[in-house]
């Protein structure tokens, strides 16, 4: 007698025999049984783990109760209250107060500012505010009878034809303080190197390699002028010295610091043509004489002659207005396309000048002064209530 049905149709329409169908159902039962056993075993393990955990100590329970109380008592309006307390006019006045006169680190005005911040914090309700002194190796621009930091075009090493502006004439009534420091790069070695000018893009190793291999320019004895960015200031000087350059000038090209059509200060927030980028030439963090340790008065200090973190050649910043005066007169072939900036000139490699500046050279005058001076951190404290022995830090610069 034939069975009423002898095949099982799959979803694909392919037939199976009854035997094959029975085997498939048996295999499915085993899989279901295995899953059930695994689930039971997992549940048993969780139950055992839960009841075998150590009980909380009284100290743990007290701490947990504090945290639960904080959550229960959380005031969701606190964030809005903080935002409502922000006063743009007060921020404006604070900024005006903190910037109304020069206060280079290690000077008397710098100490006065530290004390002002300390007292302001106390007046605003901080539990504690104090000054913490450190004796730091600092670098300063020319002072007193020292010559000015500048670049100049020279004839036979003595006759200056052009000098850069050295000061930013943006708003004289705001920038006329006689104590305003000259433009300089901190920790540049002093010196007065003279040489032909050569444009080296960003002053990276590959830029100097291009000059040598693709443009056949030997940088030995040259002054390199480079754009700000892509490498650290001190690293640019090290790169230039490695190919024989005797000095380096850095300027901020508008292509790197501004945007097309953007308004410059004081009409906008972008850098004007007289603005100069300042900063340190050091790449290592911390104080050079006490690397890795705070520069306290009792700290061991390396002899200054043993410190090798300073640039090997003089390095000086100038504005892009002054840089344009040099670059528009450079001789030599045009730069590769990736080297162009956005000054209204044809960028050329050099070396040397054309036209009325032919046979002229460039002198860099750097008169930096390095000395140990006392500086201050301002430390403010708000005592915690839940975990007073732990610290949360908020840090910012003020000098």
PLM segments and residue spans:
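Non-catalytic positions within long, well-ordered alpha-helices that form the structural scaffold/packing
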Residues: 122, 241-242
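Noncatalytic luminal/extracellular "stalk/propeptide" segments of secretory-pathway proteins
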Residues: 64-77, 93-223, 230, 254-255, ...
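Soluble metallo-hydrolase cores and metallopeptidase-like ectodomains found primarily
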Residues: 24, 28, 175-210, 285-399
């Amino acid at each position: 007698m034939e069975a009423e049905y002898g095949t099982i149709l799959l979803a694909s329409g392919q037939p199976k025999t009854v035997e094959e169908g029975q085997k498939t159902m048996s295999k499915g039962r085993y899989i279901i049984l295995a899953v059930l056993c695994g689930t039971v075993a997992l549940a048993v393990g969780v139950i055992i783990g839960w009841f075998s955990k150590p009980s909380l100590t009284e100290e743990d329970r007290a701490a947990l109760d504090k945290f639960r109380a904080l959550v229960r008592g959380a005031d969701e309006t606190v964030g809005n209250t903080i935002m409502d307390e922000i006063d743009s006019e007060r921020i404006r006045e604070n900024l005006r107060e903190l910037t109304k006169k020069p206060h280079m680190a290690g000077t008397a005005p710098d100490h006065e500012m530290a004390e002002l911040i300390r007292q302001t914090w106390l007046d605003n309700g901080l539990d504690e505010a104090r000054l913490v002194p450190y004796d730091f190796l600092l670098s300063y621009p020319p002072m007193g009878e020292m010559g000015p930091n500048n670049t100049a075009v020279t004839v036979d090493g003595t006759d200056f034809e052009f000098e850069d502006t050295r000061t930013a004439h943006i708003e004289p009534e705001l920038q006329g303080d006689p104590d305003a420091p000259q433009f300089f790069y901190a920790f540049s070695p002093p010196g007065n190197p003279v040489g032909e000018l050569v444009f080296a893009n960003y002053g990276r190793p590959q830029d100097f390699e291009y000059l040598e291999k693709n443009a056949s320019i030997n940088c030995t004895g040259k002054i390199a002028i480079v754009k700000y960015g892509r490498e650290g200031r001190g690293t640019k000087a090290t790169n230039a010295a490695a190919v024989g350059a005797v000095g380096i000038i850095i300027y901020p090209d508008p292509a790197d610091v501004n945007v097309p059509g953007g308004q410059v200060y004081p009409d906008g927030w972008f850098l004007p043509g007289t603005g100069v980028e300042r900063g340190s030439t050091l790449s290592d963090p911390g104080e050079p004489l006490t690397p890795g340790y705070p520069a306290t008065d009792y700290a061991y200090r390396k002899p200054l002659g043993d410190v090798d973190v300073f640039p090997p050649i003089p390095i000086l910043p100038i504005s892009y207005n002054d840089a344009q005066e040099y670059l528009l007169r450079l001789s030599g072939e045009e730069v590769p396309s990736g080297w162009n900036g956005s000054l209204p000139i044809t960028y050329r490699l050099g070396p040397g000048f054309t036209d009325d500046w032919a046979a002229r050279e460039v002198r860099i005058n750097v008169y930096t002064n390095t000395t140990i001076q006392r500086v201050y951190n301002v430390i403010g404290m708000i005592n915690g209530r839940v975990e007073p022995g732990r610290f949360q830090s908020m840090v910012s610069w003020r000098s």
